Amino acid sequence: MNTQTTTLDNPSADATTPNGILHAFLAAWWHGNVGEAADQFSDRFTFTDHALGLEFKDKERLTEFLAKSREFFPDTQRTDNTIFSSEDGVISEWTLTATLSEPFLGGLMRNVPIRVQGISVVQMQYGKITRWSDYYDQQTARRYGLASRFTEWTEL
C-alpha cells in the first residue's frame, strides 16, 4: 500500500494505475471536461455520494451530476491530502473548498465560503472505475441545492 499527498497539478501520474486513473478523473472534472471524467468509469459502475444520498449507475446521469456540481460551485478546488492505494483501488482523504452564492436579506446575495473534508473510496478493474463512494458532512458542504436536482419527490 502506498501513501502520498497530491494535487491536480501532477502530470506525471500513470493513467493505468489507480492513482493515475483517480488523477485523470479529477483533472478532467476540475477543468470542466465532465464527459472525459465520466469516461474514467467502467460501463458497469456505481457512484455513490453518501452525504447527498445519491447513487448513479448510468454515465449520462453521472455526467449531468458532475456538470451541475461544476455549475453550482464553479470555483471548487479539491486537494487530496492523503492517498492510500493498492493495485485495484484508492482511498483518498481530501479537502474541498468552494463558494456558494445564496439569497440574503432584502433580496441581496451573499457568498458563503465552503471548506469540507471527506474521503473517496474508489475501486477499479481493468483500468476503469467500478465503484466510487464519497463520504463527507453534507451540512458543511451546503450541497442541498445540488442534491434536490437529482432526487425524485413524491406526494404524500
What do the PLM-derived regions correspond to, one by one?
Residues N2-L156:
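C-terminal and inter-domain tail/linker signature
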